[in-house]
Regions:
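A short, sequence-level motif marking secondary-structure junctions
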Residues: 56-62, 93-98, 133-134
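Low-complexity, acidic Ser/Thr/Pro/Gly-rich terminal tails and inter-domain linkers that flank the onset
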Residues: 83-104
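Short, mixed charged/polar active-site loops
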Residues: 51, 86-90, 123-125
């Protein structure tokens, strides 16, 4: 059963690292944070040399959109399907915050898997670019307030990180505030990640040269290192995933190597949840519960105190 969501979840890690689409079509509006601030996340596909937009309004690019033909939401994924110029493009947003596994629940990484397939018998070139702006890591909009850095990761992963020049960790709080500390990461396993300036912002962009034959898939990972996550009665606390000294770079490498495992476990959880919910309240209730899982998981943060006590804070 199809349900029109009030906002479609894209990245749903925690309150500071979650973005949503508030329109029926992914390209009809800018991507937003939970409190409706614009967080520019743009997707462009060049099909046989002709450019199209599939994510974000991207008004400055003056490109036509692909046609969105479908969108589905489950407990961990939102999947869009687009068509243009003989190509079907599938964009699957997946955040593996599995509630029965604290290590997975705490991981600060989210995926966008792009797949290009031909709608005809022609081999098409499909160059996919994903742009992520400095809005992910700073509230200020001046270009000179952020720095970018290229990372050296294993297995041919291209990655960069971006963060504010000033790092006032836990320096602000309250509703209607974005994070103004820590580092945003963008990584890709089939392409290159670069930095780019557009208008009044700095972007990280992944560029994946695909085709509709034997090179039709690319996976992009979005990740975040918030350094410290919360101040709990005056005590700065780190995220649970950091308890043994793991780095964000390691999280990203594991995100690619363990993707299939994470996906299968989350799919199994979703199937069981959906069946139980449908048995209890019908298909409409099951779909509503799926969307609720996305909203709930994006509203919480798993941290650990210095004495080892685990806190799940919303």
């Amino acid at each position: 059963m199809k349900m029109r969501a009030p906002a479609y979840p894209l990245i749903t890690v925690d309150p500071y690292f979650s973005v949503w689409s508030t329109s029926n079509k992914l390209y009809e509006s800018d991507i937003k944070t939970w409190d409706s601030r614009t967080c520019f996340l743009i997707g462009k596909a060049e099909i046989d040399g002709n450019g199209y937009i599939f994510m974000g309004s991207a008004k400055d690019m003056d490109l036509p959109p692909m046609t969105q033909t479908d969108v589905t939401v489950n407990s961990f994924s939102t999947t869009y399907i687009f068509e243009a110029a003989g190509v079907r493009l599938t964009a699957d947003f997946f955040t593996p915050v599995l509630p029965i596994d604290l290590d997975m629940l705490s991981r600060p990484a989210s995926y966008l898997k792009i797949t290009a397939d031909a709608l005809d018998d022609t081999r098409h070139t499909v160059n996919v670019t994903v742009y992520a702006s400095q809005d992910f890591c700073v509230e200020r909009k001046l270009q000179n307030c952020v720095l970018t850095e290229r990372l050296e990761l294993s297995n041919g992963i291209s990655a960069m990180k971006m963060g504010g020049v000033e790092q006032a960790v836990l320096g602000s709080s309250g509703d209607d505030r974005g994070i103004d500390w820590g580092y945003f990461f963008l990584a890709c396993n089939n392409g290159t990640v670069q930095n780019k300036e557009m208008a009044d912002r700095v972007f990280l962009q992944s560029v994946s040269p695909l085709d509709t034959a034997d090179n039709n898939t690319a996976t992009v990972v979005f990740a975040y290192d918030d350094i410290y996550s919360v101040k709990y009665f005056g005590e700065p606390l780190r995220a649970y995933w950091k308890r043994d000294g793991k780095t964000t770079e390691k999280i990203i490498e594991e995100a690619f190597s363990k993707y299939d495992n994470f996906k299968s476990r989350c799919d199994e959880f979703d199937i069981n949840l959906c069946k139980s919910a449908a048995d209890a309240g019908g298909e409409k209730y099951a779909q509503l519960l799926r969307l609720s899982v996305r909203q709930i998981m994006a509203a919480c943060k798993l941290v650990v105190k210095n004495n080892g006590e685990i806190l799940y804070i919303t």
